[in-house]
């Protein structure tokens, strides 16, 4: 009579291992990774928990398992506490206030005991452009090396760059697109951003 044994190792929360032995011989061995949705690039409404001046960073609750890490140099001036009055300046740098609501984007997933790396400088990738709502700078992807192409693309977007308050970068996918296609992508991204802000 054969004797089957199933062994399961689920010590690691990210990986489960299962083996089936029959009479001491391995019949089957399976490894299953936990299905985890990547969150890099996601945008969340968050609350500042604590500002650590020594680290020049804030810890932020964005709904993850542990608070995220937000370096103060990655905080857009629109969130500086002293804009609303009563905020502090430390070492010539404005800081956030605990309890302050902010919009953040995940730059790097949390690893081991470290929380996710965050920024308030949001970037929204579109088909032909990347919208940067917290910045006023405009540009063309470095991968587009031809000066003629770079000038042509910036000429297409010059009226938008003058009128609008949002920065953008024209992606390599936008290289052979016309003014209408680039403007349409820009309009779509600005509507998306305004919807996120509401």
Each predicted region: which residue ranges?
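Single-stranded RNA-binding surfaces
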Residues: 1-198
């Amino acid at each position: 009579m054969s004797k089957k044994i199933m062994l399961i190792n689920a010590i690691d929360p990210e990986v489960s291992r299962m083996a089936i032995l029959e009479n001491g011989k391995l019949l089957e061995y399976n490894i299953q990774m936990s299905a985890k949705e990547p969150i890099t690039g996601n945008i969340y409404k968050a609350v500042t928990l604590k500002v650590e001046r020594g680290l020049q960073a804030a810890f932020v609750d964005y709904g993850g398992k542990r608070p995220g890490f937000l370096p103060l140099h990655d905080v857009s001036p629109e969130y500086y506490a002293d804009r609303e009055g009563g905020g502090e300046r430390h070492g010539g740098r404005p800081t956030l206030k605990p309890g302050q609501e902010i919009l953040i984007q995940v730059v790097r997933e949390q690893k081991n005991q470290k929380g996710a790396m965050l920024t308030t400088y949001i970037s929204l990738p579109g088909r032909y452009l990347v919208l940067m709502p917290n910045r006023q700078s405009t540009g063309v992807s470095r991968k587009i090396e031809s000066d003629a192409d770079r000038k042509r693309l910036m000429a297409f977007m010059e009226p938008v760059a003058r009128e609008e308050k949002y920065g953008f970068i024209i992606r390599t996918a936008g290289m052979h697109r016309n003014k209408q296609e680039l403007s349409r992508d820009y309009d779509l991204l600005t509507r998306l951003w305004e919807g996120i802000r509401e």
